């Protein structure tokens, strides 16, 4: 889609760079595939904040996405749509055989009129879904299942992909964007291609209000807080914090390992990140 650079005609437009929406449909989303969505504001079922810096934002309708791709037969791409709930774009697929529509994550390069299919005999083309054992080594895939039939769990954000780098018995070796190499059952499904909107990471929101529209609240530095609120808080005048950087709960940050030891999935990780 490319990027849209704004001229500095107002203070808030100075330096603003957003993803261009040229080529995306301006129609309302498919009504049968949308539902209401209540914002949690970062709270859990007890009302306690479990994720900081969440709250507010524009109202959103949830788009029901087909992450399992169980439907066989050819589908026609009707349009490419913006989805406020994720960074990648969506493709509305129409199956003429039974007159059913569904949303899938649009891979890079997909356009209205393209044909997609799912099944073991599908061609190796962007948007087609196959079992990992039928996809050639070296291919880029997204929407990868972790367990057969559970639906896609890996490589779903804008510009994300995983690469098949080898096979090991009933498993496939998959290199993730983080550099981690992981074993995935070859009976899991994956979709060919890279998720659309790779320029999402290059955008510059330009003003605080645009963050608030997205439901992102301000992040306050610990050094600017009081001692009761943060380990870095307090002190006379401006201070350095007086200790190595920590979280509000006193856990060391900036490089500390956060993965739990002896996780059951350790045996499926052949190479760590980086």
Curated annotation (Swiss-Prot):
What's a Pfam family in this record? Ribosomal_L2_C
Q: Which cysteines are joined by disulfide bonds?
A: none
Single GO BP term: translation
Q: Which GO terms describe its cellular component?
A: large ribosomal subunit
Q: Which UniProt keywords apply?
A: Ribonucleoprotein, Ribosomal protein, RNA-binding, rRNA-binding
The record, for Gene3D superfamilies, names:
2.30.30.30, Nucleic acid-binding proteins, Ribosomal protein L2, domain 3
> Is Mitochondrion tagged as a keyword?
no
Skewed-composition ranges (Basic residues):
45-59
- Where is the region Disordered? 21-59, 224-274
Compositional bias (Basic and acidic residues) at which positions? 263-274
InterPro entries cross-referenced by the UniProt entry: NA-bd_OB-fold, Rib_uL2_dom2, Ribosomal_uL2, Ribosomal_uL2_bac/org-type, Ribosomal_uL2_C, Ribosomal_uL2_CS, Ribosomal_uL2_dom3, Ribosomal_uL2_RNA-bd_dom
What are the Low complexity biased-composition ranges?
A: 32-42
A GO molecular function term, named singly, is: rRNA binding
The record ties this protein, via PANTHER family, to: LARGE RIBOSOMAL SUBUNIT PROTEIN UL2M, RIBOSOMAL PROTEIN L2
Whom does it interact with, and what assembly results?
Part of the 50S ribosomal subunit. Forms a bridge to the 30S subunit in the 70S ribosome.
Could you tell me what this protein does? One of the primary rRNA binding proteins. Required for association of the 30S and 50S subunits to form the 70S ribosome, for tRNA binding and peptide bond formation. It has been suggested to have peptidyltransferase activity; this is somewhat controversial. Makes several contacts with the 16S rRNA in the 70S ribosome.
The family line of this record is:
Belongs to the universal ribosomal protein uL2 family.
What the entry lists under HAMAP family is as follows: Ribosomal_uL2_B
Identification of the protein by name: Large ribosomal subunit protein uL2
Origin organism is Wolbachia pipientis wMel
- Source species taxonomy: Bacteria, Pseudomonadati, Pseudomonadota, Alphaproteobacteria, Rickettsiales
